[in-house]
Amino acid sequence: MEVEKSKYRSEDLDVVEEEADLKKSRRDRDRSNERKKDKGSEKRREKDRRKKRVKSSDSEDDYDRDDDEEREKRKEKERERRRRDKDRVKRRSERRKSSDSEDDVEEEDERDKRRVNEKERGHREHERDRGKDRKRDREREERKDKEREREKDRERREREREEREKERVKERERREREDGERDRREREKERGSRRNRERERSREVGNEESDDDVKRDLKRRRKEGGERKEKEREKSVGRSSRHEDSPKRKSVEDNGEKKEKKTREEELEDEQKKLDEEVEKRRRRVQEWQELKRKKEEAESESKGDADGNEPKAGKAWTLEGESDDEEGHPEEKSETEMDVDEETKPENDGDAKMVDLENETAATVSESGGDGAVDEEEIDPLDAFMNTMVLPEVEKFCNGAPPPAVNDGTLDSKMNGKESGDRPKKGFNKALGRIIQGEDSDSDYSEPKNDDDPSLDEDDEEFMKRVKKTKAEKLSLVDHSKIEYEPFRKNFYIEVKDISRMTQEEVNTYRKELELKVHGKDVPRPIKFWHQTGLTSKILDTMKKLNYEKPMPIQTQALPIIMSGRDCIGVAKTGSGKTLGFVLPMLRHIKDQPPVEAGDGPIGLVMAPTRELVQQIHSDIRKFSKPLGIRCVPVYGGSGVAQQISELKRGTEIVVCTPGRMIDILCTSSGKITNLRRVTFLVMDEADRMFDMGFEPQITRIIQNIRPERQTVLFSATFPRQVETLARKVLNKPVEIQVGGRSVVNKDITQLVEVRPESDRFLRLLELLGEWSEKGKILVFVQSQEKCDALYRDMIKSSYPCLSLHGGKDQTDRESTISDFKNDVCNLLIATSVAARGLDVKELELVVNFDAPNHYEDYVHRVGRTGRAGRKGCAVTFISEDDAKYAPDLVKALELSEQPVPDDLKALADGFMVKVKQGIEQAHGTGYGGSGFKFNEEEEEVRKAAKKAQAKEYGFEEDKSDSEDENDVVRKAGGGEISQQQATFAQIAAIAAAAKAAAAAPVSAPVTANQLLANGGGLAAMPGVLPVTVPTLPSEGAGRAAAMVAAMNLQHNLAKIQADAMPEHYEAELEINDFPQNARWKVTHKETLGPISEWTGAAITTRGQFYPTGRIPGPGERKLYLFIEGPSEKSVKHAKAELKRVLEDITNQAMSSLPGGASGRYSVL
């Protein structure tokens, strides 16, 4: 049973195995079929993709799209495969449960793994093949692109070749035109030379002789024409014989020669006709002129009864008005004075000699009177004949120094008949002499002047300095607007919207109170609320959206309607309140309404600012809006390259942002050809109070006087003192004043701290502040002077704090790069003077430190206003010491007006200073806005003269009795018999001392009485420049002492007289050159200039004194740089001084006419 059971069991196992094998074979077959199907479908899809790629080979995006689709399909297949694998695993597990053979399961697993590996390998190979195909496709595309580029390059080269060919053709045509034009000009020149020769010949002969000359000239011209034709015929025959081997070429050249021959013959005929007509016209004019001259002279001789009023001689030279043109293009008319000079320079027997030569037609040589008969008449050049006749004799006479001979009265103009005949040639000779002296053939540039009464010799030095050294305001000439017709322009562009017009007056007042607006004026427009209510263009509104300008600021809400209405305006607002945008937007609308600016036109809008940094700031703000509108803006300020500014101004610009000094330089350069102010209708003065305070009032006034009166003028500033407002209202027409907040108030968003600290503790406190604030943002430190700025900069570098420095002594490029680095976060710490207190708008400036207290209230407002701008918060710390107590009241005022707490120590310091002021111990500190610049008025001139006299008196110089301003103005006699007051006093003192010594040894019985002593004393007192000495009457026993005193005085007087007689007489003068430009000082102190002047005048010139910059005063016993002139005569010294003044004036005018490239500072970039 057990055997049978095992047998059955084995049979069952075999059946099971067979069934498993059948199942496996079926499964393998199914899998192979699926693989084949997958491969077929994969191949079909690959073929489809390739077809699609071939069709869309020009687009790389299609490839990417196909790749994305293929990737999605692969992912889907991968999911399906995983699902099938999971099912397979389930089935296998089920089979494993049902099957007892674990070996079969393992083999199945091994087969499945192999299948999976093969599938993955095939997949990788497939991916590799696809990558290769994609790479080949890309390479194919790149080759196609390269082919297209080559095709484009080939086409471009073809176009360039065609253009070069066209250029060659044009160049060839241009050369041909130039050759033709050159030939034409040569023909015209030859024709003009012939005409001139004919004119000169006709001038030398009379009426009858001119006809004979014309006939002979015509014969000669015909003969020359015939010879020229014969030569041309021979040339053409020779040319045709040389080219017989080419009949075609020969025929072409023959045709060309015939055409040329015809044209030349026609030209000769036309020329001959013109000459005939000209000769006939001249002949008629000669007859009319001679007849008119004869009648005039007869009438004059009869009226005056002169015996010399005879007929003019037949051979007299003639001058005809309208016939003096020549090849250089001189005007045709000749004045009567020139005609007279030509007649006067001719010898008296000129006409007779010519008649003899023409009748005989031969002569041995050309006579001095101008004969033409040296050779045959046809071979004489008329120009040579004229030179030999007229010019050479005069040159010989001039060289010999002989006066010209007297001329007949018949050759004189009617205006000269009242004078003697002997004076007329002398006057004409002097005119010719003047022309020859000014020529280039003179041996020296310094010829002995003939006129001793030259006003420049006696010119006062003060007048010379005023005439040569004009101020910038004086260089710009005034304009008479009544003589200029200006084009009308529109100023009112504002239309009030309904939302604003519906507001009641109470609502308007409430709205202004909310904005802290105060308005003064008549019919003031209501303030706006949004940008679209201004009436600006859509481009400007779009630009403001891009710049995130959401809502107008208080000054803008009121300034925009006022300025857009065409009213003049004064705007006073705190720092950082948007004043710049308040005048920029209306100016752009004003400019767009006017005709476009062309090259050579001046600007329409002119913006003036006091500092270069503020000019750059305004220019950058305007550029944000002007670029989209197509409006050009040019900054004009000193210290930068002027060439670029001039080129941009010449091309034309609508807006100029400038400093007043450089603008006047530009307007005066090249006589005003660079730009002008004729089209300026919108004038802006930003920080106007500072410009008036810095002394720009004369320049600003002169610029405003050159602008049309009906302009629109706008003034803006953060501070506006009353005295400056009075000056500003002179240039405004019924202005409207806008005031935001207080008149000069610090922004309330700024936290102000004032610390009373001595000088020694400030640096450590500054380092503490830097440690606290350096992480938060930028820091600006203000100091009082340039030296303090450099010293603090060095200390900060030593303390390992990277920082920048900025002050007016630096070069302009350094200043610009420093501000740029500070704004662009290159360095977050800047040490500056008050030059950065205005116009510097830096984002993220969190802290301002006044290391030195500002010297007036307005400067404090502007310094602190560099932070807390455009609604942001800021902080300002100010250091003050007891030595700066005079500035404490200004700080207390600033804190109280801006509602900030006042420290107790600061209040005590201010109160103590005011107590001293009331007691008269201290003097109150001013605002600094009284106008520190020059007034250029008579009062200031009188103050200057008084100070000069006081200084001269302090140094021991006494004024002359003639109320002269300067001792150097007069040429004085040196070392003569005069004795100065100081020397005379010293002589008296020495004489008295000698008398005292001699008194002891003198005998009592000296024969000198008191009366003699008084007489001698009186004579001594009468000496010029000697102080009178009172000599007391001496008793009889002191007669010896008195005699000794008189003897000593006589000895001193005799010695001085002997010394004066021994010294040669000479004169001296002084010329101060300290205040002239550097190149002028160098020129007049160089030996190349002083040597010729000394040789010419005989005066010795030496340089004395020391150069002192502007503002520095020489110390006691020192003098500014001057020239000391000594000479043997007063005339030589005067001439030397006049020549030095002339050199100084020339160099100074050159320096002022050429615009400076920029003021060189103390520092420059190496």
Swiss-Prot record:
Main location: nucleus
Compositionally skewed regions (Basic residues) per UniProt: 80-95
Recorded catalytic activity of this chain's protein: ATP + H2O = ADP + phosphate + H(+)
Chain ranges of the Helicase C-terminal domain: 749-910
Motif DEAD box, residue range(s) on this chain: 686-689
Residues binding ATP: 573-580
UniProt record similarity statement: Belongs to the DEAD box helicase family. DDX46/PRP5 subfamily.
Record's protein name: DEAD-box ATP-dependent RNA helicase 42
